């Protein structure tokens, strides 16, 4: 029997640990999440000014983009399951196409409406229809990104990798309102942020199609449905249970019910917290316009509204990146 080298570990580390996702690919996944969140929160920062310019009551503006959030809630679990069947890259591409199409159409519709070509009512109805593309198809990208990372990352490194992806979502809620005032362009006016973020989304889509390889998962994982990105709200994952990481290879995941006993406390807390956050965001922009007396000059309100939304998002990121790690408030152990 050969002598055992005491300096050599008795068990070799698994080969998968050397196959972490390369930084270039991780940057692409980061960009997909960042673009999705930043574009949506940029829209939220200019819509109060657009609604005032169109002469539409505040409540109808809030309902117009709340409709897409409702579609996101309904469609995201469906796309999460599809990403397990059709591949993560395909669902990312579909989600980015939905994002691009929605923002291009919304930008053109609002541009024509602000120019007086469309009546305010038709402009609002067409805007809500175009936003349906974002809620219906844009919701395919975040679950696919999460599943791509989970399926290609060993369990020991999975939490860190998924935290990075979650931080991109949160960072987008800061960047979107910060950039929106600078995207109010001379020709298209307040519709500028829609068209600029559509261009950014197109660049991201090309990079994903060109640089991201077709996914062949090394580890079992299932798609997870992210909630619609709102300014200042962390990206909660809908329908994820800690036992998902321990699923056997090849096992067919069962379809989770809305009131699954294991998830009921998280669903209720997410429902209450999400509604509270959405109500604040629904009135924050209009409140800023009223308090600053900018109803007569709505274009000047994009900057202050964006600043308020950005401040709320920064507060959330400070808790997510600073307070939670400092207090060691990690997730419960999977075992």
Regions picked out by a protein language model, each given a short descriptive name:
Residues 2-23, 213-269:
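Juxtamembrane intracellular "pre-TM" segments in multi-pass secondary transporters
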Residues 34, 116-140:
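Hydrophobic core of transmembrane alpha-helices in multi-pass small-molecule transporters
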Residues 19-69, 265, 269, 274-295:
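Helix-loop boundary and gating motifs at the non-cytosolic
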Residues 75-88, 318-332:
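Helix-to-loop junctions at the C-terminal end of transmembrane segments
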Residues 130-169:
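Cytoplasmic helix-loop-helix junction between adjacent transmembrane helices
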Residues 97-120:
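C-terminal ends and interior cores of transmembrane alpha-helices
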Residues 69-77, 173-174, 313-321:
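Residue-level signature of mid-helix packing/kink "hotspots" within the transmembrane helices
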């Amino acid at each position: 029997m050969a002598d055992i080298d005491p300096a050599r570990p008795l068990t070799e580390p698994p080969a998968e640990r050397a196959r972490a996702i390369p930084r270039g690919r991780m940057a692409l996944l980061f960009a997909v999440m960042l673009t999705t969140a930043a574009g949506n929160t940029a829209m939220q920062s200019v819509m109060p000014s657009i609604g005032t310019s169109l002469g539409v009551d505040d409540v109808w503006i809030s309902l117009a983009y709340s409709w897409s959030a409702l579609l996101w809630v309904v469609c995201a679990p469906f796309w999460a399951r599809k990403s397990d069947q059709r591949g993560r890259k395909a669902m990312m591409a579909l989600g980015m196409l939905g994002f691009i199409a929605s923002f291009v159409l919304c930008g053109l519709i609002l541009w024509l409406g602000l120019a007086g070509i469309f009546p305010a009512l038709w402009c609002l109805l067409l805007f809500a229809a175009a936003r349906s593309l974002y809620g219906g198809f844009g919701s395919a990208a975040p679950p696919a990104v999460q599943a791509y990372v989970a399926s290609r990352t060993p369990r020991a490194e999975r939490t860190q990798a998924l935290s990075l992806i979650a931080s991109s979502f949160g960072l987008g809620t800061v960047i979107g309102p910060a950039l929106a005032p600078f995207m109010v362009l001379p020709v298209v006016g307040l519709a500028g942020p829609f068209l600029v973020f559509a261009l950014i989304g197109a660049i991201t889509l090309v990079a994903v199609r060109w640089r991201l390889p077709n996914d062949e998962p090394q580890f079992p994982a299932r798609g997870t449905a992210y909630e619609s990105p709102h300014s200042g709200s962390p990206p909660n994952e809908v329908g994820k249970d800690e036992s998902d990481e321990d699923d056997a290879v090849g096992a067919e995941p069962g379809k989770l019910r809305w009131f699954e006993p294991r998830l009921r406390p998280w669903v209720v807390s997410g429902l209450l917290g999400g509604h509270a956050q959405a109500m604040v965001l629904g009135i924050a922009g209009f409140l800023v316009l009223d308090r600053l007396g900018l109803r007569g000059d709505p274009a000047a309100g994009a900057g202050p509204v964006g600043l308020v939304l950005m401040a709320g998002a920064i507060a959330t990121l400070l808790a997510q990146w600073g307070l939670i790690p400092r207090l060691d408030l990690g997730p419960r152990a999977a075992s």
